[in-house]
Regions:
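C-terminal helix-cap and adjacent tail motif
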Residues: 45-81
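Small-aliphatic-rich amphipathic alpha-helix that forms the alpha element of a beta-alpha
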Residues: 1-40
Length: 81
């Protein structure tokens, strides 16, 4: 489906924002609040909420903005043929 291409779009948007000196945060959790968000933004019933994204300037002093999560090695979750 078309929405499956959104990941590449979001990544490209985020890279371009970074190049322009902006920080971003993609937030898939918005999709779990489809009804509330749809009411707030007055979207059509057939629209699907995939995710949200924050864009702006991060506060480097805020501890949450310096969190680095643990990553599994790529060979544990991907196979390249």
């Amino acid at each position: 489906p078309q929405w499956s291409d959104l990941g590449m779009f979001l990544q490209t948007f985020m890279l371009l924002a970074k190049e322009a000196g902006l920080d971003t945060c993609a937030q898939e959790a918005w999709s779990m609040k489809q009804d509330s968000v749809s009411q707030f933004v007055k979207s059509d019933a057939e629209d699907m909420l995939f995710c949200g994204m924050c864009i702006g300037y991060k506060d480097n002093e805020a501890p949450v903005n310096n969190l680095v999560s643990e990553r599994r090695p790529i060979d544990e979750w991907a196979q390249f043929l």
